[in-house]
């Protein structure tokens, strides 16, 4: 599944090369469901994109408080949160709202 992942508000600094936009291909889960959920995507991001301090992005199976998540410009909570199912060419944006001033 091809997805576009965008990171902002300082989260891009946790990734290799500090790149804000990543066009990725995520393989479907091997659990037989064949669906890519946000929970699966967060695990995939941790394993494949985060290069340092994953605790600044994730807490347990979800994002840390203060990280805004949008799926196709819609708050992920309105889409189902961790259970939201992603589709081909979706755009997922992660923005940290917590940063120094």
UniProtKB/Swiss-Prot annotation:
Superkingdom, taxonomy of origin: Eukaryota
Keyword tags: Cytoplasm, Isopeptide bond, tRNA processing, Ubl conjugation pathway
Post-translational modification: C-terminal thiocarboxylation occurs in 2 steps, it is first acyl-adenylated (-COAMP) via the hesA/moeB/thiF part of the MOCS3 homolog, then thiocarboxylated (-COSH) via the rhodanese domain of the MOCS3 homolog.
Record GO cellular component, one term: cytosol
GO biological process, one term: tRNA wobble uridine modification
GO molecular function: protein tag activity
Subcellular location: Cytoplasm
SUPFAM superfamilies recorded: MoaD/ThiS (SSF54285)
Pfam families (UniProt xref): Urm1
Family: Belongs to the URM1 family.
Entry protein name: Ubiquitin-related modifier 1 homolog
Organism: Zea mays
Gene behind the chain: URM1
């Amino acid at each position: 599944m091809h997805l576009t992942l965008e990171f902002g508000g300082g989260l891009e600094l946790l990734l290799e090369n500090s790149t804000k936009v990543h066009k990725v291909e995520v393989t479907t889960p091997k659990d037989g469901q064949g669906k890519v959920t946000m929970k699966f995507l967060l695990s995939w991001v941790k394993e494949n994109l985060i290069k340092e301090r994953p605790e600044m992005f994730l807490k347990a199976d979800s994002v840390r408080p203060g990280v805004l998540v949008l799926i196709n410009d819609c708050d992920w909570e309105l889409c189902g949160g961790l259970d939201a199912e992603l589709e081909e060419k979706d755009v997922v944006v992660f923005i940290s709202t917590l940063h120094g001033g």
